[in-house]
């Protein structure tokens, strides 16, 4: 009986420890809130050719939360004014499918030095987006590229949650 309690106690501790979110080890891990600063955003949205309800032409306050939990990374994107939230679970270097409305999107996150890179394919629209997340201090610059069009948005680090 004592062995059972020890096994349950150990399993519970291991399972709990594996479930904790990690916020350190990569510069781009954290919670990032958009600023009002954007460059070439309307041209980027036009190049996507997606409906404006999916990608508004005006810059919306956006929050990116990126953390590691166990062997997986998680990227949560939220746009509070649209009551929109998308959670993506991924492994660096491995393509993953994400449903976004009627579209299945293929994502592959990799690293380029200190930068997080996301290659996004929207097969139903024959579009590819190349995103780069680059951190300097408490500022994250996200560069978006579709075709020859490049846009940028800037984000500031929010206090990381403890769990």
Swiss-Prot record:
Keyword annotations of the record: Secreted, Signal, Stress response
SUPFAM superfamilies, sorted: Lipocalins (SSF50814)
Region of interest (SAHS-c1), residue spans: 22-51
Keyword Signal: yes
Signal peptide boundaries: 1-19
Annotated InterPro entries: Calycin
Cellular localization per UniProt: Secreted
UniProt-annotated stretches for the region SAHS-c3: 108-157
Gene knockout outcome: Affects slightly survival under dry conditions but does not affect survival under frozen conditions.
Positions of region (SAHS-c2): 67-95
Top-rank taxon, per record: Eukaryota
One Gene Ontology CC term in the entry: extracellular region
Induction statement: Expression is highly induced during desiccation.
Additional free-text comment from the UniProt record: Trehalose, a disaccharide essential for several organisms to survive drying, is detected at low levels or not at all in some tardigrade species, indicating that tardigrades possess potentially novel mechanisms for surviving desiccation involving tardigrade-specific intrinsically disordered proteins (TDPs).
Domain notes: SAHS-c1, SAHS-c2 and SAHS-c3 are 3 highly conserved regions within the SAHS protein family.
Functional note: Secreted heat soluble protein acting as a molecular shield in water-deficient condition. Tardigrade-specific intrinsically disordered proteins (TDPs) are essential for desiccation tolerance by forming non-crystalline amorphous solids upon desiccation, and this vitrified state mirrors their protective capabilities.
Protein name, as recorded: Secretory-abundant heat soluble protein 53582
